[in-house]
Amino acid sequence: MNEKIAILSAYSFVNIEEPANLIPKLLLIGKRKYVRGTILLANEGFNGSFSGSYENVNLVLEELIKLTGPKDVNVKINYSDVHPFQKLKVRLKKEIVAMNVDDLNVDLFKGEYIEPKDWDEFITKQDVIVIDTRNDYEVEVGTFKSAINPNTKTFKQFPAWVQQNQELLKGKKIAMVCTGGIRCEKSTSLLKSIGYDEVYHLKGGILQYLEDTQNKNNLWQGECFVFDDRRAVTDDLSPVERHWLQR
């Protein structure tokens, strides 16, 4: 029986002084361990998704943590019969998730986590609004029943949507959701920076929610778009091979 391929996703908002210096080291260990995927590095932290054997993806993660020294790392592991990535890439970026807002310190200034097991109860409260921070083409594939779709084509458009919808957000508890946690975490930092106090986000994102809850209350509708060769997954995290999505 063939060993399942582990798909490890990890991110952390942590100050990295010279991220370019880490690229050769990560490429070296990743290629030695036959790991494929993408790791993004920036001064604000790292964001990676890569596949290989369970042992090897964890060795690459250990090296990434050793080189960057974060206090907290958000880690998610799924499994597949095949590699969802073609090769290993380590890239230097201005931001690990591009919002185009300067001087956000997400490491120190962000909203509160809501655990997946508590999410359904929280978002059905009358004073809570749910915002799906993903792009429109992702939301069309699947989202939460009550979620607001900002209809953005890129995450860089999200700050403008917030500015244009302050009356909608006023006086509400704001719950943010995204695929794996990184965009909603950065979104909470944006809202906190402009004066919103009660800001929350789904810990681990949609993928962790589906794994932990199996969508038992049917608040999630549709499938979840993912940024690899699987294209989308069902609420039991099985690949949806029919997906055609164009970005």
Swiss-Prot record:
Q: What is this protein called?
A: tRNA uridine(34) hydroxylase
Which pairs are disulfide-linked?
Answer: none
An example Gene Ontology molecular-function term: oxidoreductase activity, acting on paired donors, with incorporation or reduction of molecular oxygen
PROSITE patterns annotated for this entry?
Answer: RHODANESE_3
Q: What PANTHER family would the database entry show?
A: RHODANESE-LIKE DOMAIN-CONTAINING PROTEIN 7-RELATED (PTHR43268:SF3), THIOSULFATE SULFURTRANSFERASE/RHODANESE-LIKE DOMAIN-CONTAINING PROTEIN 2 (PTHR43268)
**Where does the record place the catalytic residues?**
C178
What EC number(s) does this enzyme carry?
1.14.-.-
Asked if the Swiss-Prot or TrEMBL record annotates the protein with the keyword rRNA processing, the reply is: no
Entry-linked Gene3D superfamilies: 3.30.70.100, Rhodanese-like domain
The record, for InterPro entries, names: Rhodanese-like_dom, Rhodanese-like_dom_sf, TrhO, TRHO_N
The cross-references to NCBIfam families, in alphabetical order and at most eight, read:
PRK01415.1
* Main function: Catalyzes oxygen-dependent 5-hydroxyuridine (ho5U) modification at position 34 in tRNAs.
Which Pfam families does this one have? Rhodanese, UPF0176_N
Which keywords label this protein? Answer: Oxidoreductase, tRNA processing
In the record, the note on similarity to other proteins reads: Belongs to the TrhO family.
